[in-house]
Amino acid sequence: MSIFKKSSNTAPSQHEDVEALASDEADLAALGYKQEFKREFSAWTSFCVSFSVLGLLPSFASTMYYTTGYAGTPAMVWGWLIAMVFVQCVANGMAELCSSMPTSGGLYYAAAVLAPKGWGPFAAWLTGWSNYLVQVTGPPSVAYSFAGMILTLVQLHNPNFETQNYQIFLLAVAAMIAQGFISSMPTKVLAVFNTWGTVLNMLFLAIVMITVLAVAGTKTPRGFNSNHKVWNEFDNQTDWSNGMAMLMSFAGVIWTMSGYDSPFHLSEECSNASVAAPRAIVMTSAFGGIVGWLLNLCIAYTIVDVNAAMNDDLGQPFVVYLRQVCNYKTTVALTSLTVICSFMMGQGCMVAASRVTYSYARDGVFPFSKYLAIVDKRTKTPNVCVWMNVVVGILCCLLIFAGEAAINAIFSVGAIAAFVAFTTPIFLRVFFVKEDEFKRGPWHLGKFSKINGYAACAFVLLMVPILCFPQFRGKDNTPDAMNWTCVVFGGPMLMVLIWWFVSARKWFKGPRLTIGVDDAVSEINVLEGVTKSDDDSISTLKKK
């Protein structure tokens, strides 16, 4: 029976009840889910959460080693611009899918719907687990950076202080526990908290940019770097060509910009979701890309010595850069602002991760899913999922004791896992779904949809292997210098594949609908081009 056709066996009262639903609830019902959360996010507050997850200032500080250290200032200026054009293509394609299918399952749900007949469960399985790796490694990677910067402040005050791994671990754990408590609060409180978090992020970012421009040249006689130096002089600290080093530097851009999917996962808590959520996605990527480029310009024109910043014993390139440009008190002040932004960023990551985890638990992906999918009756938030992610994040932080190379792999995993998850449904949409089989939402790209999709997919196909390349090769590629991304990402994904073929393919049938077909909505609100069989799994949705 098609879910876009009315059933002759359906009582009129059922349709009357459904037509009385708010538009957002009706759209969600059309996708097979009943309303569980309170819709207290707007386009602005959804943007605030995703911009907090983006955390431009702490994200840049955390990934400066990749963005600047691989190829120097050219990677910061025109390299960032090149990467952002294609990152925006991915964001645009995601926004179009979000407008059509505004569920917290997001990319995972879209992959199940758009995959060819018989491949829906497998597509959803891989997309879901890859996206979960993005979400669950986000909070610990941010917490690790947060802890590192706090201890760097101690080192600035006392140069004889030596940071110990257990200190980083305990600070990171404390941060995630605090963020877990905040993320367990009601949606309305989260909206207010993240609004203020975004305001502070923007304010502190502006303060840092204005300050470094104002003080440039006061500590050293060089003043601003020349245009030729900034745009043309590579400082290649890899064993690869300048072009390859430039592509490898995109890892910092991709990781920094990987938070724009958050509005998709918050769409079930957003009013006017089919319009507000995709707008928030595009706003986050576009605004983040532009402001991030301006931040890069400020640093590129004021940095004194790229090589010294990357290789200083302090181990924090951004703080070393500030020390090159500013006096002690200003360096401490700007680093402190970055630490505060980092905490806000980690909290946004925790919220987004909990919503993704809930959507998967609702569909029975995890062991003990029925317990994980419990929504707190008082706060109307998935608090069990929040604390599961806190526990997993703490386990990820144990990599701190395995060495810097192991814990740093989390950053690369976030980039590559995000790209795989973000682009899989876009790939399916572009190559396997005809235009007349896909019902666009109110936000769409029109005739540019396919072109945008081709550009996004081509960029991802290029970047996925490059993100696995080590900085050095030959005898210089020691275990400590090795890029372990292929292991840290490939290992879990290999286990997921084995799990699929051994067991999951027998019981996982894709996203489970929590509302019956006859309880859905009238034909105008339903995703076209699919039909549903008698079981309640979207994996049985087929093209007409």
Curated annotation (Swiss-Prot):
GO terms for cellular component: fungal-type vacuole; membrane. The keyword Amino-acid biosynthesis does not apply. It is found in: Membrane. It is a multi-pass membrane protein. Belongs to the amino acid-polyamine-organocation (APC) superfamily. GO terms for molecular function: amino acid transmembrane transporter activity; gamma-aminobutyric acid transmembrane transporter activity. It holds the Pfam family AA_permease_2. The chain crosses the membrane at residues 41-61, 71-91, 106-126, 166-186, 196-216, 240-260, 280-300, 332-352, 391-411, 413-433, 451-471, 484-504. Keywords: Amino-acid transport, Membrane, Transmembrane, Transmembrane helix, Transport. GO terms for biological process: amino acid transmembrane transport; gamma-aminobutyric acid transport. This is Uncharacterized amino-acid permease C584.13. InterPro entries: AA/rel_permease1.
